[in-house]
Amino acid sequence: MSRINFKKSSASTTPTSPHCPSPRLISLPRCASSSIDRKDQASPMASPSTPLYPKHSDSLHSLSGHHSAGGAGTSDKEPPKFKYKMIMVHLPFDQHSRVEVRPGETARDAISKLLKKRNITPQLCHVNASSDPKQESIELSLTMEEIASRLPGNELWVHSEYLNTVSSIKHAIVRRTFIPPKSCDVCNNPIWMMGFRCEFCQFKFHQRCSSFAPLYCDLLQSVPKNEDLVKELFGIASQVEGPDRSVAEIVLANLAPTSGQSPAATPDSSHPDLTSIKRTGGVKRHPMAVSPQNETSQLSPSGPYPRDRSSSAPNINAINDEATVQHNQRILDALEAQRLEEESRDKTGSLLSTQARHRPHFQSGHILSGARMNRLHPLVDCTPLGSNSPSSTCSSPPGGLIGQPTLGQSPNVSGSTTSSLVAAHLHTLPLTPPQSAPPQKISPGFFRNRSRSPGERLDAQRPRPPQKPHHEDWEILPNEFIIQYKVGSGSFGTVYRGEFFGTVAIKKLNVVDPTPSQMAAFKNEVAVLKKTRHLNVLLFMGWVREPEIAIITQWCEGSSLYRHIHVQEPRVEFEMGAIIDILKQVSLGMNYLHSKNIIHRDLKTNNIFLMDDMSTVKIGDFGLATVKTKWTVNGGQQQQQPTGSILWMAPEVIRMQDDNPYTPQSDVYSFGICMYEILSSHLPYSNINNRDQILFMVGRGYLRPDRSKIRHDTPKSMLKLYDNCIMFDRNERPVFGEVLERLRDIILPKLTRSQSAPNVLHLDSQYSVMDAVMRSQMLSWSYIPPATAKTPQSAAAAAAANKKAYYNVYGLI
């Protein structure tokens, strides 16, 4: 690659474009109010070729073929023809993109769009024509056409020494056990036991908060542990020009993990906020004095310093600077007034006067009540003068003061006193204690807040919210629903129409004084029922414990299949296509229930509902084996008795010879009886009135429904399916998945065969004129040999043959 020559530019004082706001860097989550977002000042960390911040003419360079002393005459030349229509741009963090060379678009606008899409701050970057960041930068005020015409290749590099040092796009997340619990940096709630943490940036979060974790890894959190990173940051800070250079070096010196004090980290800097805290003569030491009066004053929460943790460590919380205390007190009072004002808006919907409210006097170490702060949503720390822990030392100015306007000051004054980088990170970095203090863990906040004393933990005057009465999951309280009227009763309970956020069906179960084991089994079944969601299954909405055990399900606006077949007048004669569709939907719903290990145990036409549109089928009253099981005591042992509707009961259920006769095949048998009802419009065994006789004969396999009552247009494949569903041996019955496939394979004829006899004309009657004409045509079509056509016997035989052929064609014989 040939060396590129650069030239100075005189048009570099162009103001920042208002259409290119500076985006917030993801890896710096606490810089919402930093000075980086200011458009009227250039960041001291910005390169001379920063995409959004052009500098003076002596710091911008332009690409040119030769270094010329004067720039006169350049406007008279024609715009150069560019060689490349697309330019490859290499971005930080090993990213790359392509930029289209558009006429009139400057390089600053084009490259800034790429950086903003990736949430990279353009002020912290500079652009080179080489992969070496030490090479001279290009002038971004030039158009992309001019740059493309002078580039030896179609590549540009965007470098940022600062981002490469303090940020990374790769977290080192590991699973951690937090004992004691730590606060999540996303939701600020405690992490109980198991959680996740990045080993680089120390970002902690719950598993449920993983989607809100920052994309970039902020390596500044590891500054107190990494000496190499501190050296690199000192090198970057040395490149900062102007009054902000000393501020950056002071902050970095206080964060450095070295035992000695850095020469740059002196409190005698020119910054007014830094000089307000003096190390010499600014700290009062309060030794511990054990006395009743001292103990009373220490345990009182109203005192300025309630309690010291150790008698060997000095109390460094008292700062002998009254002006600074008053200054911070004004800030805290203003913040408290703002908080009370916002609370008044939330409660009344209008702005209430807060001047008459009592503003509490903040003591050292008291945090603004109600303020929650984490690394994603930072707030101003209200600790006025540093850490309140007796084992830590405040080596840096308080957060929220540098780079922010104080009361009575203009924003311009505060904006010129700090660098954008320092203001963005100052209140997010932990402090490092000196050698005299015991070691402590790094806190994610700027200050390590002192834990409260026992007398401070509870506030007797604070109103506590009333506790909500406890009830189990999906349990509905008696005052939350209304019973309207009775709908009907069945084998296991009575159904009512009711109101529970809409019309519902409330079924009171026939259960009296359930035992603890039965109640536990009932809750387990409810836990399964609440997970059922299917188009052909009634929606389970909850259960009721008192005054009677009941379940609440979806209300079906329609009638049961039993009423459509046997009760309503005139009776509904379903077409064969509608019958197949109903049976398909029942098979779909039952196949879904069996996939959830739910046995219906009482499938019948009374529990199959047709909606008002007559096209949707719903299955109800499923599951609840505990309620549908009846136990009797015989010889000191419990024996299970069959319960349910005997007409739909499978033979093995009637016999009760197995420990658990209820299987998916027993539901298939009940489905076969439902098929018989809808195909014959009759109940099975209607000619037998003795209930015990039906139980005995069906249980032994001597009795089956009368197949002769089934309608004659039933396809043979459906008849075969019906026979398989009501087989005596349950192992020979299909499952509902197979039943569904066989129903889908049934093909109905497009034309329906007529069941009435045709009007056949007798041969000895007089034919009509039309019959005579057609008979003559048939005679003319027949082939008669010439030798035999002359004889009358042959002619009569031919006519008789034609008549037979005529009637065979029209189906009359």
Swiss-Prot record:
Pfam families: C1_1, PK_Tyr_Ser-Thr, RBD. The active site is at residue 602. GO terms for cellular component: cytoplasm. Zn(2+) 1 binds at residues 198, 201, 217. A zinc finger (Phorbol-ester/DAG-type) spans 170-217. Residues 481-748 form the Protein kinase domain. Zn(2+) 2 binds at residues 184, 187, 206, 209. Disruption phenotype: RNAi-mediated knockdown causes a defect in pachytene progression resulting in a proximal gonad devoid of nuclei. The phenotype is more severe in gck-1 (km15) mutant. RNAi-mediated knockdown in adults decreases lifespan. Binds 2 Zn(2+) ions per subunit. Residues 9-23, 386-399 have a biased composition (Low complexity). CDD domains: C1_Raf (cd20811), STKc_Raf (cd14062). The keyword RNA-binding does not apply. One of its GO terms (molecular function) is MAP kinase kinase kinase activity. Changing residue 118 to W: In n2506; 86% larval lethal, 93% abnormal vulval development. PROSITE patterns: PROTEIN_KINASE_ATP (PS00107), PROTEIN_KINASE_DOM (PS50011), PROTEIN_KINASE_ST (PS00108), RBD (PS50898), ZF_DAG_PE_1 (PS00479), ZF_DAG_PE_2 (PS50081). Its EC number is 2.7.11.1. It comes from the Eukaryota. PANTHER family: RAF HOMOLOG SERINE_THREONINE-PROTEIN KINASE RAF (PTHR44329:SF262), SERINE/THREONINE-PROTEIN KINASE TNNI3K-RELATED (PTHR44329). This is Raf homolog serine/threonine-protein kinase. The lineage of its organism: Eukaryota, Metazoa, Ecdysozoa, Nematoda, Chromadorea. The gene is lin-45.
